Amino acid sequence: PDAVVLAVGATPTVPPVAGMDSPKVVDCVTALTGADLPGQRILVVGGGLVGCETALGYAQAGKTVTIVEALPDILSAGIPVPEMNASMLRDLLAEWKVTLRTGCRLAQVTAEGAVVTGPQGEATLPADHVVLAVGFTPRPSLAGELAGTGMEVYQVGDGSKVGSVMTAIASAYTVARAL
């Protein structure tokens, strides 16, 4: 081939804290694809759009849900959420009684749940499952190995830079037009 287009996507980011190998830890992709998590208490780490939508889904399924967000407010990092959507999502989280723990960081996953640190110090939050929604990391690709082969190599979508479906489509379109 004269050119190779790599669209390898991204993987959920796993924070470097103790307990990530626990069977109670689930990434957001697994959670959003309809994973039935046994138990009642779900702790979602990350208050961006993916974390909030995941939390809302489990709350609507009858689970008791807490969001732990390191920043002072949810929906304040990552891809900007239009204000009307953010307002509606905040209202739905309140209506479904999702607990928000902002300004808190995950310190450890334990048999009881998770240890978080925040303005009031350290606290253990009981949880049957901990869902990680702290972002995505571009998946490694063959771009480096293909360099110097004489082929044109293009990376598109989340494989080059994590974004939205719109940015993925735009990057693929740009490459397709160039070819």
Task: Report each predicted region and the residues it spans.
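Rossmann-like dinucleotide/flavin-binding elements
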Residues: 3, 8-24, 29-80, 116-179
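A conserved short coil-to-beta-strand element within the FAD-binding core of flavoproteins
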Residues: 10-15, 102-113
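N-terminal glycine-rich dinucleotide-binding loop that anchors FAD/FMN and/or NAD(P) in oxidoreductases
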Residues: 19-20, 24, 80-107, 177-179
